[in-house]
Structure formats: C-alpha cells, structure tokens
C-alpha cells in the first residue's frame, strides 16, 4: 500500500478536455469535487495527504490543443475576466476561440473545498498566474487564511 509511505499526493484535477466536444471545461469545480471524492472516499487516501491540483492556464474545447493552451496571465491580457471561467481569445494563427480556465471565483471555491475535506491546493504553474490583484494564488491564500 502506497498511502502510508508518501507524504502527500497532488491530485491533478485538470486537463479533462476534448478536441471534438465543444463547450467542455477542462477543470471545473465538479471535476475537483469528483477527483477528491474518488481518491479520499473510494480509494481510501487519507484526506491529510490529498492536495487538489488547480491550473493557472486555460484550454479550448472542440478544437486542436496545439498552440491553443494559454496561461492565465495571457488570458487576462487578452481581455479575460478574472472572475469568470471562459473568454474569447486569439492565439496567433488561429481565429478567435473560447478558452476555459479557472477564474478567482472558482479558485476560491476549490480552495475552500480542499481546506474543508483535504490537505489544500497546489497550482500548475506559478509563472502562468497573474502577478497582481488578479492572482489565483492570492485568491486561494485569502480563502484559506494564509498570507500571500
């Protein structure tokens, strides 16, 4: 059994995307809840070792993933709203498309969920986050009562 000999597990509750099904979010709140429930309640992982993975990037749905994944900071620079979870963006040679990401509202909900039933959150990757008041890491820290 692996659980007793590992300090923590990063549960990657993201990248659940489709290249053929449009309007599918790759990392919504429901997926976070489902993943934590599966590992803690179904597989028996100690909640004290379960760390919820949160993305600081967005993915489109229903189109190729090549050169269409954008950092959260890039999404905001193209007019994305830090409180929402989708935006219409443009990535170079592609026409405008909808990208799905976690805004501050969803990150706060996920941070609260992870604080309530697990050991916290981790982000993939910090450099993709916004460096200002729109920061996802700051939103999570504020939610769980930690300094940023």
What is the predicted role of each segment?
Residues 1-81:
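Substrate-binding surface in catalytic domains of secreted glycosidases
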Residues 9, 121-122:
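Hydrophobic residues within beta-strands of alpha/beta enzymes
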Residues 17, 59-61, 100-102, 127-132:
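Acidic-and-aromatic substrate-binding clefts and catalytic sites of carbohydrate-active enzymes
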Residues 47-117, 138-148:
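Glycan-binding loop/region signatures in secreted carbohydrate-active enzymes
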Residues 122, 127-148:
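A recurrent domain-boundary module in secreted/ectodomain proteins
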């Amino acid at each position: 059994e692996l659980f007793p000999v590992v300090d923590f597990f990063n549960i990657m509750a993201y990248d659940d995307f489709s290249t053929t099904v449009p309007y599918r979010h790759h990392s919504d709140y429901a997926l976070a809840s489902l993943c934590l429930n599966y590992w803690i309640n179904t597989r028996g992982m100690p909640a004290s070792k379960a760390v919820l993975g949160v993305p600081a990037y967005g993915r489109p749905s229903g189109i190729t993933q090549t050169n269409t994944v954008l950092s959260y900071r890039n999404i905001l620079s193209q007019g994305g709203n830090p409180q929402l979870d989708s935006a219409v963006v443009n990535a170079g040679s592609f026409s405008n498309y909808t990208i799905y990401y976690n805004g501050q509202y969803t990150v706060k909900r996920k941070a609260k969920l992870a604080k309530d039933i697990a050991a916290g959150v981790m982000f993939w990757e910090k450099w993709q986050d916004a460096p200002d008041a729109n920061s996802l890491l700051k939103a999570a820290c504020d939610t769980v009562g930690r300094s940023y």
